[in-house]
């Protein structure tokens, strides 16, 4: 059984053995990183965190021809490309084009409560005038959802984000609009 006492005893034994061998603690903050890797020494976040504190909450739509696309908080702020390197603005453009090809309209909302694609899709569907929504994670995973289904009982899930291309995203938009 592993417990706190055992962890402390092992830690003390390792430290005692290191001290007995003459090993001295070293400051690794200035140690050069392995070739090809960047050093994090003295670095802070690349960009400051984005605050949505004063953001206006999305309202439920009334247009029966509306499909809402729900994206996560990090979408195009912290993360700008899918896992396969496709720019998120292109992904959105293609999903919207697919929706428009079927004669429907689209609206994009940020879902700030969750990063789970199923819940993002459900929230988008609840905000949509048609009751159909698309959840889109920054990594590219996509789901088509309907407002009266359970969160994980979506209409369609596209988990193969690394294999998806822009044509696939366009087809997802078309499929959601049918």
Model region roles, listed by residue range:
Residues 1-48:
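Protein-protein interaction and targeting regions used for scaffolding, dimerization, and localization
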């Amino acid at each position: 059984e592993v417990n706190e006492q055992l962890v402390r005893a092992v830690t003390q034994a390792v430290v005692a053995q290191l001290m007995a061998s003459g090993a001295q603690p070293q400051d690794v903050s200035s140690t050069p990183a392995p070739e090809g890797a960047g050093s994090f020494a003295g670095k802070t976040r690349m960009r400051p965190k984005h605050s949505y504190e004063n953001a206006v909450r999305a309202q439920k739509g009334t247009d029966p021809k509306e499909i809402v696309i729900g994206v996560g908080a990090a979408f195009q702020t912290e993360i700008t490309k899918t896992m396969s390197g496709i720019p998120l603005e292109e992904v959105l453009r293609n999903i919207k084009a697919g929706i428009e090809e079927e004669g429907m309209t689209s609206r994009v909302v940020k879902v700030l409560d969750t990063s789970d694609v199923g819940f993002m899709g459900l929230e988008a569907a609840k905000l949509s005038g048609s009751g159909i929504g698309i959840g889109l994670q920054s990594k590219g995973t996509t789901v088509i959802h309907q407002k009266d289904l359970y969160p994980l009982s979506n209409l369609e899930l596209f988990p193969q984000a690394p294999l998806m291309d822009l044509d696939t995203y366009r087809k997802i938009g078309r499929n959601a609009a049918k």
